[in-house]
């Protein structure tokens, strides 16, 4: 597994629960924190590597799974030029793009989302699985109820800065 994010510290945070588990199961030597070799290595040789989303992410490795956190801020050229090629020799590689929607410059997440939407209802669904938590397209973006649709962690006690509830 290669875990990347817009910041290396974010990628480490995603790995943290698995790292704590690996330490309990295999001892401290199974997990490295905070240096260039941060990640998990099991006695079987299986590894979970951590990297910032930059031009060298994954280069030199052959991986089965890439986990891209905060994919809205990872440019598509990082995935296509660095991370994607590391999976080219694998039989069933997976790339997981996890993210909020981002903005108009979020080309990686937006392009894969659109590819998945374009295959909806077709006989051949393609090879992209889209799991999305979002408001309906016709929802009013100024309505607090719409905000609740778009947030799986919504809490009614939030302080709404726009003068709402």
Annotate the PLM regions.
Residues 1-2, 65, 94:
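Residue-level preference for the first positions of well-ordered beta-strands
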Residues 2-54, 113, 117-131:
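Conserved nucleotide-state-sensing and coupling region of NTP-binding domains
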Residues 5, 70, 99-100:
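Conserved residues at beta->alpha junctions
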Residues 9-12, 48, 57-58, 74-75, ...:
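Flexible loop/turn segments at secondary-structure boundaries
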Residues 19, 23-26, 72, 84, ...:
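Hydrophobic/aromatic-lined pockets within catalytic cores
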Residues 35-88:
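Conserved RecA-like ASCE ATPase "motif II neighborhood" in helicase/translocase motors
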Residues 36-37, 77-165:
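Non-catalytic, compositionally simple segments
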């Amino acid at each position: 597994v290669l875990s990347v994010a817009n910041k290396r510290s974010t990628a480490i945070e995603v790995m943290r629960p698995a790292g704590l588990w690996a330490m309990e199961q295999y001892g401290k030597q199974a997990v490295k924190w905070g240096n260039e070799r941060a990640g998990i290595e099991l006695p079987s040789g299986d590894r979970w590597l951590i990297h910032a989303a930059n031009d060298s992410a994954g280069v030199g490795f052959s991986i089965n799974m890439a986990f891209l956190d905060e994919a809205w801020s990872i440019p598509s050229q990082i995935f296509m030029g660095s991370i994607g090629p590391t999976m080219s020799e694998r039989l069933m590689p997976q790339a997981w793009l996890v993210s909020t929607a981002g903005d108009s410059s979020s080309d990686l997440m937006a392009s894969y989302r659109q590819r998945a939407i374009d295959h909806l209802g077709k006989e051949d669904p393609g090879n992209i699985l889209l799991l999305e938590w979002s408001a309906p397209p016709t929802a009013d973006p100024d309505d607090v109820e719409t905000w609740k649709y778009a947030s799986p962690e919504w809490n009614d006690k939030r302080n709404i800065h726009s003068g709402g509830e």
